UniProtKB/Swiss-Prot annotation:
GO terms classed as biological process: photorespiration; reductive pentose-phosphate cycle
Keywords in alphabetical order: Calvin cycle, Carbon dioxide fixation, Chloroplast, Photorespiration, Photosynthesis, Plastid, Transit peptide
Protein's name in the database: Ribulose bisphosphate carboxylase small subunit, chloroplastic
Quaternary structure annotation from Swiss-Prot or TrEMBL: Heterohexadecamer of 8 large and 8 small subunits.
GO MF term list: ribulose-bisphosphate carboxylase activity
Similarity-based family: Belongs to the RuBisCO small chain family.
Note: The basic functional RuBisCO is composed of a large chain homodimer in a 'head-to-tail' conformation. In form I RuBisCO this homodimer is arranged in a barrel-like tetramer with the small subunits forming a tetrameric 'cap' on each end of the 'barrel'.
Superkingdom in the source lineage: Eukaryota
Principal localisation: plastid
GO cellular component: chloroplast
Span of the transit peptide along the chain: 1-46
Length: 175
């Protein structure tokens, strides 16, 4: 048997010409008066403050900010609900890690907080979480209360921030 040859229609493709110029990209454009030597944030330095290294305890994610208002808490809880995380409330009398009975880390050194009720699975709105924070404050007026965003798909705590602090330690940071 003789092999058969099939005629095919060949399409011509333009040969590779190399990379295009990046002159059209915004990164490479510079104004005529701009040079690297004129870059400065000196105007902003006057309004910056340095966080003191002693005397103010740092707690959770947002500890560098002033205490959150109810509106701020609503926005944070809305963020964790939109991220598909489950809101949980925890409270503890001492809001930081300490070692009282042993030098090695352990269960009783403040890493674990007491959970308030159950995680709020299926919570559709942040307005359901804030009344629970108020209920913790009524039941236990002195402890710290934090809100946790729990990712039940990855089984991890994704976000944690202080919702309320005991009276008298709002600005001083002394617990």
């Amino acid at each position: 048997m003789a092999p058969t040859v099939m005629a095919s229609s060949a399409t011509s493709v333009a040969p590779f010409q190399g990379l295009k110029s990046t002159a059209g990209l915004p990164v490479s454009r510079r104004s005529n008066g701009a040079s690297l030597g004129s870059v400065s944030n000196g105007g902003r330095i006057r309004c910056m403050q340095v966080w003191p290294i002693e005397g103010i305890k740092k707690f959770e994610t947002l500890s560098y900010l002033p205490p959150l208002s109810t509106e701020g808490l609503l926005k944070q809880v809305d963020y964790l609900i939109r991220s598909k995380w489950v809101p949980c409330l925890e409270f503890r009398k001492v809001g930081f890690i300490f070692r009282e009975h042993n030098v090695s880390p352990g269960y009783y050194d403040g890493r674990y907080w007491t959970m308030w009720k159950l995680p709020m699975f299926g919570c559709p709105a942040p307005t359901q979480v804030i009344p629970e924070v108020e209920e913790v404050r009524k039941e236990y007026p002195d402890p710290y209360c934090r809100i946790i965003g729990f990712d039940n798909m990855r089984q991890v705590q994704s976000v944690s921030f202080i919702a309320s602090k005991p009276p008298g330690c709002e600005e001083s940071g002394k617990a």
